[in-house]
Amino acid sequence: MTIRKNSGLVPINIQLYKTTPIQTILQAEQQDRFLQPAELSQLLSYMKSGVLRLEIAETLSRNSTNIVNAASNRIFVGGSPLSYLEKPEDSIDISSIDTKNTKFSFSNIFKNLFSNEDSIPAGFKPITIVKYGSNKMRKSLRDLDWFLRYLSYAIIIGDPNILAVNIKGLREIIENACSTAATIVALRTMKRTCIKLFSSNPEAESIVNQYFNVIIQEFEAPSLSDRIRKRNSADLQGLTLPQTYFLSSSTQFKYAMKPNLSVEEKNEIIRAAYRQVFERDIVKAYSLSLTKMESRVKIGQISMKEFIRALGKSSLYRKEFFDSFSNSRVVELAFRHFLGRGISSLEEFQKYFAIVSQEGLGGLVDTLINSKEYSDYFGEETVPYLRSLGEEAQECRNWGVQIKLFNYSARFQKKPQFITLFKDYQTPLPDQHPYGHSNDPLAIQFGAIFSKKTSTAFVNKDVRRILIYKGAPIENQLSRPLKLNAYKELNSYNLQIIKQSDNLTENIIRACYLRVFGRNPYTEEKLILQPIENQFRDKCISIKELIRALSKSNLFRKLYWTPFYVCKSIEYIHIRLLGRPTYGRKEINNYFNISAQGGFYKLIDAIIDSEEYSQVFGDNIIPYERYLTPYNLSLGTLRVSSIREKFKKLQPPVDKKFVELGRVKEIRSKNNIILKLNQGVSKRREQTVIFARHINNSQSSLEQIIKAAYRQVFERDIDPYTIGREFYSIETLFYAGSLSVKEFIEHLGQSELYRKEFFEPYPNTKVIELGTKHFLGRAPKDQGEIRLYNQILRSQGLKSFVKSLINSQEYIEIFGDSIVPYRRFPTLPAGTFPNTDILYKNLTKQKFFILMPSYKNTKLLSV
């Protein structure tokens, strides 16, 4: 059987009914405008009546049993009809039902009938429950309850369309099983019963009466005939559309140019023509229009048909839909614009392609507009419209591209869709896996992997995979395998059948682990599998049952079932237990059904208990790899084309001494040697001087420590600033040994001079950068550190910030009590070297930017 590509699948959900909001908004949307005051008023009245409609529906739902009971008692005699009503137990309140009237005699029936205001339908006779039968009674009570439910649905959505769609045509169906006259009597009884429930609310009574009248009228009306799609060629499909689909679908507003219309209405019709031909309102979007042709069609000099012809021949249409497209795509778009549909067949495409090739755009437009199809659908006055789903029956062939042609983005698609599809119809597909992405996928490419959303499956269940056997072959991939003993000599595969013995038991268990799990279990996993091993060692189970037990273990389930979707899991398990990939869709569908109905364990049993497993492996053979896909086989084969020539001449390396391997082969100059000696980090790290206080420091050494502290904290020598004797007292205490270097640094950081120089002029983020530079000898590490110190600054102030830096664990470990802080990262490697280097190279008083901002820089846009 030859398999060819199909047109793809675009799922379309049929609209089941109309609602007041949808119909109001849909008209404005199709006309590309805002809602008018009258439409807004209609929506407002619907919204205001929403509470009342919900109350009506709630009352009907609460009293539904009584309403159905009253209707059934009018038409059934000889028992209690309500007992045949199938409803959930909690939805029927028996105590609220008037049981006195559940049994009626013939005299009471006719007395009640003739006391009604409505006339009795001709041919009505009360129905005896015993003769009617319990099965028909249940169906009749179900139908009465169905009528009442749909009444509540229609009242809630505010449109009786759902009643017309679902009730029209039921008369013929009920006539074959029951009595039409009895149904009408029951509906009228339900109407009167419901109206009595709302006797105190005239508005609610009017709504219920209106919708019940629709139910009765639609039931009495004859069913409508199907809509026939007109066909003008023998190569086109004959199509019919049920009237219910047409009634429930969104109404396609049709515009017809009449002489007695107002100017505003004529302008709206002209704009509808623009939207159809140019796929947009060119007056609103681009302020373009064909003024001369508009005037002529308004005064009646030309018909709407000729106006459409003029639009198709205009320079704007040529520029938008002809010059930048191939002739194939021009024909497809012209069908959408002038006939409202897509191309039906290759013969139709060839006909119009020849016209556009010989006569150009004008000839194509004339042929389409002069066609009988155009005259039948649009005539002289109607603007063409899209004949989409619901408007008329759609062809099954070309479904995907047909629906895509109706999309707004169709004009942006340059590639012709229909002719490409017609070519694919005639090109057979090669054999491929039905779930694969390519023609010959890997054995591990599982599941429904499709290249396009609208082309979900190019193949059917008869397409099968290409498999290359490795070991015992089968004559036909679709037939059952032959027994292994039919092949005594297997040249392509050296098969060893391992039979159970005491010496080989452990080897068999390890081989089963490798085959089933793909690896040896871990120690803790083996403890869980120990009972299965013991059963096999005690010869209580065969190799087949050992494979079954391992496959049903939690370890196997965790490896090949839980992490994947069903199709992928089936492929994994199938390869592990049967030694080959699945043949095709028919086989994998069977396993999919087993998994859906019975679950994981049923799938394992179905594979191991299969006839193929029994004939190939039996009870004493461990499963092995039997089949491969061609691509998998090529991956595991060392091909000659992949082996370069130089690899064939490789000689084993000769061991050499380390000194010989490190010997310089080229001649190096003196400058080259100096350059290599000086490469790497600079000498700054080695040249760093650390000032520390010791017990035997001299007076001059203490002075150097004080000056180094000033330079580190204030970034300069502050001798000119000591005139005010601000630091005289702390210097005296430091010389006397009462203050350590750490305490001296802390006093400097908490001084008024430091506050004036490094706190007041800057934001908190800059203060934190300078603080870590002065007291820790580095830049801030990250945003987390900045947030921490920012919180301290904001809540406790500068002194607490300096104290937290100096008392930090980092300061104590690196500087202790006797070392003046210094630049800690003058060279690489260091995590904060780049920021520290920038921080030390910049002049603090000349550059105020923040090194590590917590937000990105933004540019002010000039207005």
Swiss-Prot record:
Similarity remark: Belongs to the phycobilisome linker protein family.
Gene3D superfamilies: Phycobilisome linker domain, Phycocyanins
Post-translational modification: Contains one covalently linked bilin chromophore. This protein autochromophorylates (Potential).
Keyword Iron-sulfur annotated: no
PANTHER family, per the entry: PHYCOBILIPROTEIN APCE, PHYCOBILISOME 32.1 KDA LINKER POLYPEPTIDE, PHYCOCYANIN-ASSOCIATED, ROD 2-RELATED
Cellular component GO terms held in the UniProt record: chloroplast thylakoid membrane; phycobilisome
Name recorded for this polypeptide: Phycobiliprotein ApcE
Alphabetical UniProt keywords: Antenna complex, Bile pigment, Chloroplast, Chromophore, Electron transport, Lyase, Membrane, Photosynthesis, Phycobilisome, Plastid, Repeat, Thylakoid, Transport
SUPFAM superfamilies: Globin-like (SSF46458)
Organism: Galdieria sulphuraria
Membrane topology: Peripheral membrane protein
Compartments in which it is found: Plastid, Chloroplast thylakoid membrane
GO molecular function terms attached to this record: lyase activity
Xref: InterPro entries: Globin-like_sf, PBS_linker_dom, PBS_linker_sf, Phycobilisome_asu/bsu, Phycobilisome_asu/bsu_sf
